[in-house]
Amino acid sequence: MKVLRKNHPLLKIVNHSFIDLPTPSNISSWWNFGSLLGTCLVIQILTGLFLAMHYTSDTTTAFSSVAHICRDVNYGWLIRYLHANGASMFFICLFIHVGRGIYYGSYILSETWNIGIILFLTTMATAFVGYVLPWGQMSFWGATVITNLLSAIPYIGNTLVEWIWGGFSVDKATLTRFFAFHFILPFIITALALVHLLFLHETGSNNPSGLNSDSDKIPFHPYYTTKDLLGIFLLLLVLMILALFFPDVLGDPDNFTPANPLNTPAHIKPEWYFLFAYAILRSIPNKLGGVLALILSILILAAFPLLNTSKQHGLIFRPVTQVIYWIFIANLLVLTWIGGQPVEYPFTMIGQIASITYFTIIIILMPVSNTIENNIIKL
């Protein structure tokens, strides 16, 4: 068996990636989230496949087809709620994975980091088009509001919006194409994830100390396969608790009402995992400015490798930047809260302050703290 796994053309790739892979001996549980994201992706593809067998992407039957899945299909309610809450688990793991990357300086591996940003954007696009499919009130109005943002693009904006809609409003053509996108994008995510792994295994993993670990490596199997399995079981436990006991806690009550173009919900908002970006979008009064800020809120992650001036890897020995990092996390939570609030005082003002703080921390405070710490080391 040993000879086979080391010599067989296909098994050799698996062996080098998951069995004999030299791994730092000190990586903590924060490194588990890569495998958890892979697990979430598999769960989403499998549950999504079974949902697609019963779903109809037509404006007249989409809402009732989801109701049919929950009522008449064997364990359809479970598949539907695993898929809906699986998306939330996916984003929780994604945010922690990115947060760990920032804390421990994983952005130094720039190719892996940049592919990760593309993965993040693709996952956000997949979740957005997926949210439209049940064709409830929030699905319809969320799709209308977010796609309408493209009209802020000079000259081609209105044409682009009508092209995406497939008409003069969000309608049957929009729903059909969004279903097609939602079906194909997870497979693109899978391909990108393999490229992400490929680049990671070219350089090897980072580790909590931020020091070179070439002299202290252990094989991935059995040490980290066991550790990852524990993480996967805990993830499945949390997902099952969510799906079985609190299936609608992260959803929107408006989505239990079929889409009605003549009745606008009181507060239009996306799913919870987009609220931080939505708050940044709303905090700028100008439409084009808001759209640019929304895009920059994600693309600014690409600036981390460029703005890094620290002589140390990661924040474990950098107390000043550690404080700034945790302020940044708290600020993100404030933005998430504000994104779900109505557009009125004091929420608008808090949102504007939090949005300015978000960009200030990344562009100014972190590089300045890096310089301060470099000077402290010299003393």
Curated annotation (Swiss-Prot):
Cofactor binding: number and manner: Binds 2 heme b groups non-covalently.
Pfam families: Cytochrom_B_C, Cytochrome_B
Intracellular or extracellular location(s): Mitochondrion inner membrane
Cofactor entry: heme b
Assigned keywords, A-Z: Electron transport, Heme, Iron, Membrane, Metal-binding, Mitochondrion, Mitochondrion inner membrane, Respiratory chain, Transmembrane, Transmembrane helix, Transport, Ubiquinone
Ligand binding (heme b b566): 97, 196
InterPro entries (alphabetical): Cyt_b/b6_C (IPR005798), Cyt_b/b6_C_sf (IPR036150), Cyt_b/b6_N (IPR005797), Cytb/b6-like_sf (IPR027387), Cytochrome_b (IPR030689), Cytochrome_b_C_euk/bac (IPR048260), Cytochrome_b_N_euk/bac (IPR048259), Di-haem_cyt_TM (IPR016174)
Binding site for heme b b562: 83, 182
Subcellular location, principal: mitochondrion
Gene Ontology terms: cellular component: mitochondrial inner membrane; respiratory chain complex III
Transmembrane segments: 33-53, 77-98, 113-133, 178-198, 226-246, 288-308, 320-340, 347-367
Membrane association type: Multi-pass membrane protein
Molecular-function annotations in GO: metal ion binding; ubiquinol-cytochrome-c reductase activity
Residue numbers binding a ubiquinone: 201
Any one GO BP annotation for this protein: mitochondrial electron transport, ubiquinol to cytochrome c
UniProt KW Metal-binding keyword: yes
Subunit: The cytochrome bc1 complex contains 11 subunits: 3 respiratory subunits (MT-CYB, CYC1 and UQCRFS1), 2 core proteins (UQCRC1 and UQCRC2) and 6 low-molecular weight proteins (UQCRH/QCR6, UQCRB/QCR7, UQCRQ/QCR8, UQCR10/QCR9, UQCR11/QCR10 and a cleavage product of UQCRFS1). This cytochrome bc1 complex then forms a dimer.
Other comments on record: Heme 1 (or BL or b562) is low-potential and absorbs at about 562 nm, and heme 2 (or BH or b566) is high-potential and absorbs at about 566 nm.
Physiological role: Component of the ubiquinol-cytochrome c reductase complex (complex III or cytochrome b-c1 complex) that is part of the mitochondrial respiratory chain. The b-c1 complex mediates electron transfer from ubiquinol to cytochrome c. Contributes to the generation of a proton gradient across the mitochondrial membrane that is then used for ATP synthesis.
Family under the similarity heading: Belongs to the cytochrome b family.
Name of the protein: Cytochrome b
